[in-house]
Design a protein with these regions (language model features):
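RNase H-like, metal-dependent nuclease domains and their acidic two-metal-ion catalytic environment used
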Residues: 1-27, 31-33, 38-159
């Protein structure tokens, strides 16, 4: 028979809470309009998970720019690279460059314009950019041997 592996799927809830809310955010190269002299934690920095993940992607791209163009050193897992062979690379780049950030929130937190707001302004949904952004979300990885048990069809729980 075929030996399979079960994979835990974790849905992305962009409007949900930020990851590691009490960890201090490192504002490397930030052009954020807030007080960059004051340390802020993730909960103070971002309105939701979507904003946090887009900002993490922005930071990763900025670090890559600093590494490639300015000679700065960063760990490889803090950088990003896209294959030049991606057929929709120009479209992906366009989407990533036009993610609108909101500046009018009183909290001073990073906020990304919602999809309904983008639609009202005639901005197409950034589906490719969203896919790359979602990869920034922290997911706990664990291993479990499922070969000895299987889900109960009646309850959906593991026996």
């Amino acid at each position: 028979g075929v030996k399979g592996k079960r994979i835990k799927l974790v849905p992305f809830h962009g409007g949900g809470a930020v990851d590691s809310p009490f960890d201090v955010y490192d504002e490397i190269g930030s052009d954020f309009a807030g007080d960059i002299d004051k340390e802020r934690n993730n909960a103070e920095m971002f309105t939701n998970a979507r904003a946090q993940c887009y900002w993490m992607l922005r930071d990763r791209m900025f670090k890559t720019y600093l590494a490639v163009d300015k000679g700065h050193n960063f760990p490889n897992d803090e950088l990003i690279s896209f294959s030049s062979g991606i057929s929709e690379l120009a479209g992906l780049r366009a989407e990533l460059c036009r993610i609108p950030r909101k500046y009018n929130n009183a909290s001073g937190k990073v906020q990304i314009m919602s999809k309904p707001e983008m639609k009202k302004l005639g901005i197409q949904s950034p589906n490719m950019a969203d896919a790359v952004m979602m990869l920034q979300k922290h997911v706990d990885i664990y291993e479990h041997d499922y070969t000895d048990n299987s889900p109960s069809r009646a309850t959906g729980n593991w026996a």
